[in-house]
Amino acid sequence: MYRVFYLPVIVFLLSSCSSDTDKDQSLLSSLIAPNFSYKQDYFNCNLNKGNSLINIESFFSKIVDKYSKKSLEDLSLFLLFPDKDEIINSFTISIISQKNYESVLTLIEILKNQGIEDLASCSFAIHQKNGIKLINYSESNNDLFLQEILRCRFNEGYNYGTFKLSIDRFSNQIQSLKVPYALSYVESKDNFDFLWINSFYEENYIETLSTRWIVLNDSDEIKDEFIANATCVDSSLYKAYKLI
């Protein structure tokens, strides 16, 4: 069982100096918008009485075959299971789409037609939140990994633009260290609530981060700035399985 590790990797370039130049830079930064590249949907499910993960595994194995025949190549399908629970009664269906609502709807129809409602009760409200991959990790071919999802909200006066340059700095650090880690940012329509999604591709990720990144001089500054400028409601750790 893994211990939930809150990875405070958001950084805000905030200066204590109140010069006009700093104010102008802050204003310009606040106008920067994310270059969103995909849509993210999460569907939470609860297992019906008498069903187990074996039933879910068998069901989705058939779905993968049927989905492939549909040639809907613009979707990625993941199953997320709570990592800390010994007895799993719930799971989450994660769908990444290339801004294609119809493809997501088609996949949901496939799930329903194949009988997912006999196995689990799922909420299939499509929200199509905007997402962007801030750090890619393409060296892993492992379809099983750990994913931590933090639900956060910007503090008043701050948004994605105010920490864009800092995200780039952090990204450069992680990539130079070759840490097996990926980072995604999913924003709500109000631009204030967001998901900070950490993906870890090795079991001893805490040790790796502790010995390679957290020891860097500016890691404490990054943690302090994260706490000062954004508030996270909670963090959930999942075992993630990529199906498509």
Task: Kindly give the residue locations of the regions a language model identified.
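Classical Sec-dependent N-terminal signal peptides that target proteins to the secretory pathway
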Residues: 1-21
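Short S/T/G/P-rich N-terminal loop/turn motif that feeds into the first structured element of a domain
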Residues: 17-219, 228-244
